[in-house]
Amino acid sequence: MTITELQHQYAGHPNVEALNKLLGEPAVRHIYCGGLYASAASLFASALVEKSPCPFVFILGDLEEAGYFYHDLTQVLGTERILFFPSSFRRSVKYGQKDAANEILRTEVLSRLQKGEEGLCIVTYPDALAEKVVSRQELSENTLKLHVGERVDTG
């Protein structure tokens, strides 16, 4: 059985339809799904994402779990809409070792959210959400847009 066949099987499941309908209700803002193990969670999530233009935020238990979930989602849906929002720290916040690559990933997620792109899927974990981020206004005021071939004075 291929990934596409599995995805179609999950997409037709009555629980996906029921949850999709529930997500359409304005009063519902947060949903916890339990009982989905291994790659079943990402297949279920991909079926939901395919049916809705709204952004989704999937909060997993820790970095490792989020990494596996992110990988599974990208295998099913591709990498264009799936974003990973990691902690900006290499190890734990208490050690204070920033990771430049993770800071770039965080900035990309915030930037694409600010643009209002439809159908985004953000995968993260509690440690990453605990960090402060700049406000939308501050990000907008401090964003410098450059074009290919443009000269910039760094002095």
What are these regions (language model features)?
Residues M1-G155:
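ASCE RecA-like P-loop NTPase motor cores
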